[in-house]
Amino acid sequence: MAPSALPERSEPVTRAELEAFKLDRLRGLLRDVLPQNAFCAAKLSRVAADRLASLDDLAEWPFTFKEELVAAASNGLPGNLTWPPERYVRFHQTSGTHGRPLPVFDTRDDWAWWMECWRVILDRGGVTPDDRVLVASSFGPYAGFWSGFEAVIDRGGLAISAGGMPSLGRLQLARSLAATVLMATPSYALHLAEVAEEHKIDLAALPVRLVIVMGEPGGSIP
């Protein structure tokens, strides 16, 4: 089995080492997925995915679009499952802002991957066990906020659920609990700022030092 991460060492990883690691991991993933996943097998049937020679070969691979995944889903199940349904332990779905929501099933290993991704995000933001993180979400089936909330708990910080609260209530909760980090979508973070202005709440006086945004393209724009 291919290693799940590059070995830790003091000197930087070279580009060649990184690409070799990625290729090895991808080959292992394909060996597991293609025999079990009819959607992926059909999608990659014309590119000899089982004979991937280099990462450059990926330039010839077809894109997979969200519309295809939504169309393949039926009876609440994704159309691209690799394992039997009983192996999955978590259900989430996309927000449905643009069309029908896309169901997402995760195994325990999948969820561990989510947590590893969030570990990197929290590291980059300098989030520590001393932080108090207000998660401004309705806590419906949207995966992003559930994963972020659990990652804060794993970090040892205080994860503050603000589900089911009006925007003003969330601002008041952030103030009363001295939240140091806000987690929200970009558009909702801007909406909170507008509500604060309407109710004459001085955002600069709040202890929030970091805003982590997700779920919309704005989160990737510096």
Question: Model features per residue range: what roles?
Answer:
Residues 33, 94, 133, 182:
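Residue-level signal for inorganic ion chemistry
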Residues 123-155:
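Conserved AMP-binding loop of ANL adenylate-forming enzymes
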Residues 115-132, 166-179:
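Conserved ATP-dependent adenylate/AMP-binding module captured primarily in the ANL superfamily
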Residues 1-32, 155-222:
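Active-site glycine/GP-rich loop and adjacent strand/helix microenvironment
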Residues 1-93, 99-116, 123-124:
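Nucleotide 5′-phosphate-binding alpha/beta core
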Residues 88, 111, 138-141, 187:
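Short glycine-enriched loops at secondary-structure junctions
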Residues 110-111, 137, 158-162:
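Short, flexible loop segments at the rims of nucleotide/cofactor-binding pockets, characterized by
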Residues 99-106, 130-137, 174:
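Short acidic, glycine/Ser/Thr-rich loop/turn "cap" segments at secondary-structure junctions
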